[in-house]
A protein has these predicted regions:
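Cation-handling catalytic/transport regions enriched in His/Asp/Glu
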Residues: 1-284
Length: 284
């Protein structure tokens, strides 16, 4: 923080210079501000800036109070005066879910889950298994991460990940399976650029699959308490993502609709957003 603080003046100056470039881009294209220019450039026709502001308000009034209740429970469980940022990462029950032993158990469990969602999904994932299109287990020297990659020649998807026997591996495979089902669904499109989904919808199929499959996670968990923990963690994780998402988006909206602001005003506005969307975490 000391190093960043010492460079604040320089970083603020660079920010202002880059902001002015974007403002000129928007004005040269005939738009009042850069936000409206980007909405048009990105082809966003299904929602407006006003819809986004309404989304911010909905999160503030519906999600934030619930997250504050959760953090109140966390504060009481940890027996601390306030929940600090590092307290949010503590698993309160200290139980690590280990739902499978090897990649064979993982893939077979995922196939059973997908069959309960839609039999065709299970058949496609089983085809990937039989065709060698799954590289799931962690091993020495293997690249980190996880992804689904559509293969251009065969039009089939390939899933890569690093499973080590934890619950997050189940979610990762189901997530990437959502991408894979999307790949199968679009494989007959012949115009290659049409296959490239824009970033704001690229995760719909994958994250949607995470939630569509939650009712069937019992294929991995025979203990009801483990199943409830897995589901609760999934739902809480989704809700906890929203405050920071709103802060970043609201900040960008304000930056470009208030082009004459100073660095000091920018700091004050960001601090206000941190307060507005604070789920009960003490950052002092």
């Amino acid at each position: 923080m000391e190093t960043l603080g010492s460079a604040k003046e320089e970083l603020d100056s660079l920010f202002d210079q880059l902001k002015e470039v974007r403002i000129r881009q928007a004005h040269n294209a005939g738009f009042e501000n850069y936000r409206d220019y980007k909405h048009r450039e990105l082809g966003r026709f299904s929602y407006s800036p006003e819809d986004i502001m309404a989304f911010h308000d909905a999160v503030e009034h519906e999600v934030i109070p619930f997250l504050r209740e959760l953090n109140q429970e966390r504060r009481d469980a940890l027996e601390v005066e306030s929940v600090r940022p590092w307290d949010t990462a503590v698993d309160l029950d200290g139980k690590t879910l280990k739902p499978f032993g090897d990649s064979e158990e993982l893939i077979n469990g995922a196939i059973r889950i997908l069959k309960d969602v839609k039999e065709g999904y299970a058949a496609q994932l089983e085809m990937m298994k039989n065709s060698g299109l799954l590289d799931l287990e962690n091993r020495k020297g293997k690249a980190p991460g996880g992804y689904n990659y559509p293969l251009a020649e065969t039009k089939a998807p390939f899933i890569f990940m690093n499973a080590v026997g934890l619950h997050r591996d189940v979610v990762t495979l189901l997530h990437e399976s959502g991408h894979a089902m999307h790949t199968f669904a679009t494989r007959d499109i012949t115009i290659t650029p049409y296959l490239h989904t824009p970033s704001e919808v690229a995760e719909l199929a994958s994250m949607g699959m995470e939630f569509l499959t939650m009712d069937y996670w019992g294929h991995f968990y025979s203990d009801p308490s483990d199943l409830n923990k897995a589901r609760r963690d999934q739902l809480e994780g989704a809700l906890k993502f929203l405050p920071w998402c709103m802060i970043v988006d609201a900040f960008q909206q304000w930056i470009y609709t208030h082009p004459g602001h100073t660095a000091e005003e920018r700091d004050v506005y960001f601090a206000g957003l941190m307060d507005r969307f604070n789920p009960g975490v003490d950052w002092s």
